[in-house]
């Protein structure tokens, strides 16, 4: 039986007992990790995933953390420019030994999922919180029905103690001049009278 797994942006065809060099995993030597991204299970009854085979996994034991071969990057500008630059790089890798290929039941195995260094383990998605609508105060009207009154202006009116259309309709010019929190327009008073009557 063989499996095709995906890790570190690459795909590998593996069998039990294979030694594999993969991109660095967040695991120490001796730990057992599980690759859950299995693209295909081969054997007597091959199974191809779309894109992954559900419930399938490949378990492996981490042998050691290693570095790959050194890659030299050399840049030289020619002729009258005596400029040279050499940069070396060694990729960090993890050497693993494939121990078992699970065609099903990978979720209940209890083995730590193989994640790259610096990646967070996939957490269960939390259900999105529904935004609770703010309950309207008892006996108050929706002041945003007045033309030119938005949510911010409605809050200012409520802060000034005006919560109903009847209160706004009963305002005199002296009352309007005495309110400093918001400038009340005469059209609001007329509209409030109409809305208060229903």
Curated annotation (Swiss-Prot):
The keyword Ribosomal protein applies. GO terms for molecular function: nucleotide binding; rRNA binding; structural constituent of ribosome. Keywords: Ribonucleoprotein, Ribosomal protein, RNA-binding, rRNA-binding. Gene3D superfamilies: 5' to 3' exonuclease, C-terminal subdomain. GO terms for biological process: translation. It comes from the Bacteria. One of its GO terms (cellular component) is cytoplasm. The keyword Zinc-finger does not apply. Belongs to the bacterial ribosomal protein bL21 family. HAMAP family: Ribosomal_bL21. Part of the 50S ribosomal subunit. Contacts protein L20. This protein binds to 23S rRNA in the presence of protein L20. This is Large ribosomal subunit protein bL21. The gene is rplU.
């Amino acid at each position: 039986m063989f499996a095709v797994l995906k890790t570190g942006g690459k795909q590998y065809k593996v069998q039990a007992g294979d030694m594999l060099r993969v991109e660095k995993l967040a695991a120490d030597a001796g730990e057992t990790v599980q690759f859950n991204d299995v693209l295909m299970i081969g054997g007597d009854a091959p199974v191809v995933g779309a894109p992954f085979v559900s419930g399938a996994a490949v378990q492996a034991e981490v042998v050691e953390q290693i570095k790959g071969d050194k890659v030299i990057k050399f840049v030289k500008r020619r002729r009258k420019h005596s400029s040279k630059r050499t940069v070396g790089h060694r990729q960090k890798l993890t050497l693993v030994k494939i121990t078992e290929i699970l065609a099903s039941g990978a979720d209940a195995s209890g083995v730590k999922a193989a994640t790259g260094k610096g990646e967070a383990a996939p957490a269960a998605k939390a259900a999105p919180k529904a935004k609770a609508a703010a309950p309207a105060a008892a006996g108050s009207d929706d002041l945003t029905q007045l033309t030119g009154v938005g949510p911010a202006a409605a809050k200012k009116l409520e802060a000034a103690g005006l919560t109903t259309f009847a209160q706004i309709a009963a305002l005199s010019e002296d009352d309007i001049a005495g309110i400093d929190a918001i400038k009340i327009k005469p059209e609001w008073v007329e509209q409030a009278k109409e809305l208060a009557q229903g």
